[in-house]
Amino acid sequence: MISFSSFYQQIADSNLQHWLETLPSILGKWQRDHKHGNLPKWEKVLNKLHYPAPDQVDFVDSVTVGSGEQLSPGEKEKLENLLRLFMPWRKGPFHIHGIHIDTEWRSDWKWDRVKQHISPLKNRTVLDVGCGSGYHMWRMLGSGAKRVVGIDPSPLFLCQFEAVKRLAGTHHPVHLLPLGIEELPPLDAFDTVFSMGVLYHRRSPIDHLLQLRDQLRTGGELVLETLVIDGDENAVLVPQDRYGKMNNVWFIPSVAALMLWLKKCDFTDIRCVDTDVTALAEQRRTDWMPNESLVEYLDPNDITKTVEGYPAPKRATIIAVKNQPNQDLIS
């Protein structure tokens, strides 16, 4: 069974220690709720990942574990077969002992767009909301973060993350907790909070922004990346049914509307640092994710539109700072 005890020990003497009042019971319930289904099968695979400590790691320019020279061809083949049992791999890429996990998303491209605009992460405590399998968490560690905590309720993402961590070394201060943000108390503790690719999946985007705000210390930085449309501060797309074949997309605002929402939630120093139309080369079917991908979500006769006729995915990155508490929002 995946254990979270080392995380509990690490935060016991930190500004996250009050989280220990509720976290163990919440994670215990999650484990009980998932003792059937795929999780036990994936945990058995994790228990087979017994490999020597890597001769090198790189989290600065990539997520690379091992040089590729440590394992024999047979050992490498066995490892690749084990890692393929965690398919589909969506966020990456990862380079593990010479094995290239070519994920659906080129998450390194997103990181390259974001990293130049954020406050330096050196010695910061970071929260990554909706972290997936943890690719960006490793890059945050490579940027000097003191501790990185990711939350995502998916059992598969947790096991993919655990696989990489067990191969990279469990001593790294990077932790994935299978939680949704609604399960977090107001921690007011993180120096930087990332929410990338989450907002449009939330039924109440304003509540999501307030939940993100509750995790930041005063003066902490929010890095928000989400789908946007063109238009003024009143422009918000509410898909009738699906958007890009996704049935869990609720609100897609314009950049101006999103900045107004953040202002209403009492963020300050709000600025849009990047907008980018998602390229077919950034999200695509691969050998490690053989299902439908972006090209199938777009109109085959006009890739500027989704199959439903909406504008094709365009993403913006907004950075904002948590202001002093507003009693009206708290109440």
UniProtKB/Swiss-Prot annotation:
Task: Quote the record's binding site residues for carboxy-S-adenosyl-L-methionine.
Answer: K91, W105, K110, G130, D152, P153, S154, I181, E182, M196, Y200, R315
Coiled coil location: none
Known catalysed reaction(s)?
A: carboxy-S-adenosyl-L-methionine + 5-hydroxyuridine(34) in tRNA = 5-carboxymethoxyuridine(34) in tRNA + S-adenosyl-L-homocysteine + H(+)
- Keywords per UniProt: Transferase, tRNA processing
Which Enzyme Commission numbers does its entry carry?
Answer: 2.5.1.-
Pfam families the UniProt entry points to:
Methyltransf_9 (PF08003)
Signal sequence span per UniProt? none
| InterPro entries attached to this UniProt entry | CmoB, Mo5U34_MeTrfas-like, SAM-dependent_MTases_sf
- Output the superkingdom of the source species: Bacteria
Q: Name one GO molecular function term.
A: transferase activity, transferring alkyl or aryl (other than methyl) groups
Q: Which CDD domains match?
A: AdoMet_MTases
SUPFAM superfamilies referenced in this protein's UniProt entry, alphabetically: S-adenosyl-L-methionine-dependent methyltransferases
Q: What does this protein do?
A: Catalyzes carboxymethyl transfer from carboxy-S-adenosyl-L-methionine (Cx-SAM) to 5-hydroxyuridine (ho5U) to form 5-carboxymethoxyuridine (cmo5U) at position 34 in tRNAs.
- Fill in the subunit field for this protein: Homotetramer.
Could you identify this protein by its name? tRNA U34 carboxymethyltransferase
Organism for this UniProt entry: Shewanella baltica (strain OS185)
Show the taxonomic lineage. Answer: Bacteria, Pseudomonadati, Pseudomonadota, Gammaproteobacteria, Alteromonadales
